[in-house]
Curated annotation (Swiss-Prot):
Keywords: ATP-binding, Ligase, Nucleotide-binding
Organism, as annotated: Shigella flexneri
Protein name as catalogued: Putative glutamate--cysteine ligase 2
Keyword set includes ATP-binding: yes
Family: Belongs to the glutamate--cysteine ligase type 2 family. YbdK subfamily.
NCBIfam families linked to this entry: gshA_cyan_rel, PRK13516.1
């Protein structure tokens, strides 16, 4: 399928997607019933969409195009209420978090969807292992060239986004020692990590043509980069965050990305170059392994900075942009989080350290999501 023209959208508008876990009490393992829930809510959603993702244990909540985080929060809140009622009617529960703490990938059923079945044929068991749960944020752009500039700018802050959203320390019943373990799942995919370097939209079109020669890429949706342009929406899509445990934290993360995008495109503070990515995977690893306690390295100077310090610096830089777009509350909440030194991954570990079980942890996550 050829790459569509870049659809011009209103700059800085938002679209947010949350991949939620569908679990089956009292054992709180993943259920395979998302299709049943989607059927139950399809005529009750007035804004946004509830839909499938790769496997039957995944339920995606997606907003419509929103002007700001308050509008997005309102849409999510209404969807959440409908989904929770449908889940209760079918003796199921819903929670966030980037990975199910103890699920077995072999049990996961890929949705009966042509694209997902084709992906299963291409990638085999990797797709079942990819039953992990993330938050994706789309930001509107006025042109393809703006999208490429924004993508490179946001890529500088991938470690910050990963650390702030970290919520997947447990996998397959084990403490992985990572803050988020979810990003590691995609390391075997040929398109894992950053997008190959291009400097403008014309070069991106040439890149896509080259990738399509592999026959594994039918559309932009088949590319699993950390950040990717979405020409059919006219957006840049950030894909590195774990699904948070609360709706409020998901909205705050979206506000962070929207405000960062506004700062990047209005002030153009960087002259991007391919060397910017020289230490990308090393800095990304620091955020995954250590969360906000990680240390990132500047590829141009060799300077090393604590991720906590650099995140506070980012929040300060984007505060004026956040004020202009109505996202100040998000930046203030994230500032408090960084100063406290806590993320959701650490709270999960604290629960287990205090004697809680992994089953109890998922139950608590369901209570947190329903109570937010």
């Amino acid at each position: 399928m050829p790459l569509p023209d870049f659809h011009v959208s209103e700059p800085f508008t938002l679209g947010i997607e949350l991949e939620m876990q569908v679990v089956n009490p009292p054992g709180y393992d993943l259920s395979q019933d998302s299709s049943m829930l989607i059927d139950a809510v399809k005529n009750k959603i007035t804004a946004g969409e509830v839909k499938h993702d790769i496997t039957e244990s995944m339920l995606e909540l997606a907003t419509d195009v929103c002007r700001d985080i308050n509008q997005a929060a309102g849409q999510f809140s209404a969807m959440q209420k409908v989904v929770l009622q449908a889940a209760a009617d079918h003796h199921l529960e819903i929670c966030g978090g980037g990975t199910p703490p103890f699920q077995k990938w072999q049990r996961q059923e890929v949705c009966d969807n042509e694209r997902y079945q084709r992906t299963l044929e291409n990638f085999g068991y990797l797709i079942q292992q990819a039953t992990v749960f993330g938050q994706h944020v789309h930001v509107g752009c006025a042109s393809g060239d703006d999208a490429i500039y924004l993508l490179h700018g946001l890529s500088r802050f991938v470690p910050h986004f990963i650390a702030l959203s970290a919520a997947s320390p447990y996998m397959q019943g084990t403490d992985t020692r990572f803050a988020p373990s979810r990003p590691n799942i995609f390391s075997a995919f040929p398109d894992n990590g950053p997008m190959p370097w291009v400097s403008n939209w014309q070069q991106f079109e040439a890149l896509f043509r080259c990738l399509s020669y592999t026959t594994m890429i039918d559309s932009i949706k088949d590319l699993h980069w950390d950040i990717r342009p979405s020409p059919h929406f006219g957006t840049v899509e950030v894909r590195v965050m774990d699904t948070p445990l609360t709706l409020s934290h998901a909205v705050n993360m979206a506000g962070l990305i929207q405000a960062t995008a506004h700062w990047l495109l209005t002030e153009r503070p960087f002259k991007h170059q391919e060397k910017d990515y020289l230490l990308y995977k090393f800095n990304r690893f620091q955020a995954c392994r250590y969360g906000l306690e990680g240390v990132i390295t500047d590829p141009h100077t060799g300077d090393r900075r604590p991720l906590t310090e650099d995140t506070l610096r980012l929040l300060e830089k984007i505060a004026p942009s956040a004020h202009k777009i109505g996202a100040s509350s998000a930046i203030e909440a994230l500032h408090r989080q960084v100063v406290s030194g806590l993320n959701e991954a650490q709270l999960m570990r604290d629960f287990v350290a205090d004697g809680g079980s992994l089953i109890g942890l998922v139950k608590k996550h369901c209570e947190i999501w329903a109570g937010d």
